[in-house]
Design a protein with these regions (language model features):
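Serine-hydrolase catalytic machinery in alpha/beta-hydrolase-like enzymes
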Residues: 8-117
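A domain-start/cap signature at the N-terminus of enzymes
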Residues: 1-7
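Primarily recognizes the serine-hydrolase "nucleophile elbow" in alpha/beta-hydrolase
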Residues: 99-164
Length: 227
């Protein structure tokens, strides 16, 4: 497996990412991986995101994980670290994904141009799960998505009421970010086809469960990869 550090432009900013792929696969499927909020472990080296990238790349996908603006070495429009912190704190307080969706869209456009395929998938974790879901609704080329630790209690899921794409929701039974009651209520707004997978004796961070989660996403993507 090759991991290639790449850069792409988003809203006038240079963002960083890591493209993972098997050089022996000539026509890979592609998958974009959206990390969580930077104040909650959210960069492209997050344990869940890196596991997804590795497992997918080892199974015929080219995956791109990336850092949102102001995270890691990705540029921002703020002048210093304190301003970047306040920027992301305001996003967390307002549950505002708009800039992150712009960055994820730019990442997807880069990935699509780099690999030259329309066979696309997306996965996101926590805050990134919401970004991935919103991008899935907006982008007709995305075949299916995996949403991990979706913060059901903070975001309205009715925008998925007409989404007919295959959807996987992985949730922990002891997740501080959302309760099982909130998961159940949120799932009621989401159309079929959908899969809810609740992982027992697990919390929001999925320590030692990363490979299991990645394989769940892989199965969903593989089962929906045929033209």
């Amino acid at each position: 497996m090759i991991e290639e550090h790449v850069h792409f432009n988003s809203d006038g900013l240079k963002l960083e990412g890591v493209l993972s792929y098997d050089e022996n696969v000539l026509n890979p499927l592609i998958a974009l991986l959206c990390p969580p909020h930077p104040h909650l472990g959210g960069d492209m080296e997050n344990n869940v995101i890196t596991a997804l990238g590795s497992v997918l790349a080892e199974n015929g996908f080219a995956s791109l994980r990336f850092n949102y603006r102001g995270v890691g070495n990705s540029e921002s429009k703020q002048g210093n670290i304190a301003e970047v912190y306040e920027y992301w704190e305001s996003i967390l307080n307002r549950d505002d994904c708009s800039d992150a969706i712009v960055d994820a869209t730019s990442a997807m456009n880069y990935l699509e141009s780099a690999i030259d395929t329309k066979n696309m998938f997306i996965a996101g974790y926590s805050f990134g799960a919401v970004v991935a879901m919103m991008l899935s609704v907006a982008n007709a080329n995305i075949r299916a998505f995996a949403s991990i630790s979706t913060p059901f209690g903070r975001f309205d899921t009715t925008f998925l009421s007409d989404c007919k794409k295959p959807k996987l929701f992985v949730c922990a039974d002891n997740d501080f970010a959302t309760s099982l009651e909130e998961v159940e209520m949120g799932m009621q707004n989401i159309s079929e086809p959908k899969i809810l997978d609740i992982m027992n004796e697990c919390d929001h961070f999925y320590i030692d469960k990363e490979q299991e989660i990645a394989n769940k996403a892989l199965r969903l993507f593989d089962s929906n990869s045929s033209a």
